[in-house]
């Protein structure tokens, strides 16, 4: 049985196990059916620990759409989402190593890592995400820390299976030894490792990151429904939001700030924090739009906007509007978890973010307009498919 796309797992990278997400799967016995991620049912997206269960009347979908973002806040870019075949082998991924063509493989994204580390791995490097394997993950990390403290390189560690007998494999038809030639060195990039104190520091930083918890933003049901509508308009109906929006992200943030700052004394610490939060939302939006907030069908429009002389001096928050801004709040919990903010700062930020979400909900009829979406032209559809 091949693990489902968008499911979480543990994957070996070097001698350690890392939490990962399966973006694509490849099964040589079912070529053509499991080799790529489809845009059909959208993956469930968590907003902190809130999972949307809203159901649209015109369809059975009950999940919040992933606006190019994964539940843990990581990006799954075109390479992850679009299947490119090898020359002469239409059912084989282009970047799959030749020696792996006859076995089940998964294209994984390691949680908290940049997309450049996404890779195809053999089924023997993938474990189910369960208590036994999480225990194994901790044992491997402890062994690596001990080796690093003694000045040993990670490569000097025993093979992973020698450290524990508790590993529970992902359900597959066959399993090979972790000591095989296809283990950690597999993939298009060499595994980067550091030994001694540097390795110890890396592990300790990673351990700190894993201890952080994503904040749980309270998002009104009608905004969750708005996200589902947005997903369906773009991915199913092949519609685009007309750009530039009449009311942009910058305009919305200004209106929110004007309304919110009435509660604070000018020049007070609270007023300063509000200014920082508003500036931060704008910054996050501008930096993340092109990488995690767009559906694949919208990328051609984004390229046209960024290459247009009319918008060369504008930021994306001066072009896009509420539709794309709302998508940011799906990814924000994961993005915030990757910062170094202390618990008190996160709590203050959470309060302001939820104020802003309530503001969007209150003004939903003003900012979210169905007529903002228009059908894409046949020429655009051809360009979006690379024709």
UniProtKB/Swiss-Prot annotation:
Cellular component aspect of the GO annotation: NuA4 histone acetyltransferase complex; Rpd3S complex
Primary location recorded for the protein, binned into one broad class: nucleus
Coiled coil: none
Region feature Disordered, mapped onto this chain: 52-96, 159-197
Compartments where found: Nucleus
Sequence ranges assigned to domain MRG in this UniProt record: 211-385
InterPro entries, A to Z: Chromo-like_dom_sf, Chromo/chromo_shadow_dom, MRG, MRG_C_sf, MRG_dom, MSL3_chromo-like
Compositional bias (Basic and acidic residues): 76-92
Matching Gene3D superfamilies: 2.30.30.140, MRG domain
Keywords noted in UniProt: Chromatin regulator, DNA damage, DNA repair, Nucleus, Transcription, Transcription regulation
GO biological process: chromatin remodeling; DNA repair; regulation of DNA-templated transcription
Family per similarity comment: Belongs to the MRG family.
Subunit structure, interactors included: Component of the NuA4 histone acetyltransferase complex.
Known function: Involved in deacetylation of histones, chromatin assembly and chromosome segregation. May act as a transcriptional oscillator, directing histone deacetylases to specific chromosomal domains. Component of the NuA4 histone acetyltransferase complex which is involved in transcriptional activation of selected genes principally by acetylation of nucleosomal histone H4 and H2A. The NuA4 complex is also involved in DNA repair.
Protein name, per record: Chromatin modification-related protein EAF3
Species assigned in the record: Yarrowia lipolytica (strain CLIB 122 / E 150)
């Amino acid at each position: 049985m091949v693990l489902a796309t968008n499911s979480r797992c543990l994957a070996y990278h070097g001698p350690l196990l890392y939490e990962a997400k399966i973006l694509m799967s490849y099964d040589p016995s079912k070529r053509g059916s499991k080799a790529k991620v489809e845009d059909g049912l959208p993956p469930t997206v968590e907003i902190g620990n809130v999972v949307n269960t809203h159901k649209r009347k015109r369809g059975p979908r009950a999940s919040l759409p992933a606006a190019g973002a994964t539940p843990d806040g990581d990006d799954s870019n075109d390479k992850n989402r679009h299947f490119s075949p090898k020359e002469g082998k239409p059912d084989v991924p282009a970047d799959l190593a030749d020696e792996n063509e006859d076995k089940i493989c998964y294209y994984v994204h390691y949680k908290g890592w940049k997309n450049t580390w996404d890779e195809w791995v053999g089924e023997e490097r993938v474990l189910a995400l369960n208590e036994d394997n999480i225990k194994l993950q901790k044992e491997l990390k402890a062994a690596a820390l001990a080796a690093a403290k003694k000045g040993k390189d990670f490569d000097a560690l025993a093979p992973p299976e020698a450290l524990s007998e508790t590993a529970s494999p992902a359900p597959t038809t066959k399993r090979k030894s972790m000591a095989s030639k296809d283990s950690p060195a597999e993939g298009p990039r060499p595994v980067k490792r550091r030994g001694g104190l540097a390795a110890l520091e890396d592990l300790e930083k990673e351990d700190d990151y894993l201890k952080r918890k994503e904040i749980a933003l309270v998002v009104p049901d009608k905004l969750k429904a708005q996200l589902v509508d947005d997903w369906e308009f773009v991915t199913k109906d092949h519609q685009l939001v007309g750009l530039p929006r009449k009311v942009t992200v910058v305009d919305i943030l200004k209106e929110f700030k004007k309304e919110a700052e009435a509660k604070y004394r000018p020049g007070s610490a609270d007023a300063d924090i509000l200014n920082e939060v508003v500036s931060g939302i704008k910054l996050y939006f501008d930096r993340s739009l092109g990488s995690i907030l767009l559906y694949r069908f919208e990328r051609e429009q984004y390229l046209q906007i960024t290459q247009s002389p009319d918008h060369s001096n504008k930021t994306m928050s001066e072009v896009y509007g509420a539709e794309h801004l709302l998508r940011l709040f799906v990814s924000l919990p994961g993005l915030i978890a990757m910062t170094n903010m202390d618990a008190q700062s996160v709590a203050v930020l959470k309060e302001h973010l939820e104020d802003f979400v309530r503001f969007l909900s209150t003004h939903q009829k003003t900012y979210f307009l169905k007529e903002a979406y228009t059908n894409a032209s046949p020429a655009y559809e051809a360009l979006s498919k690379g024709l």
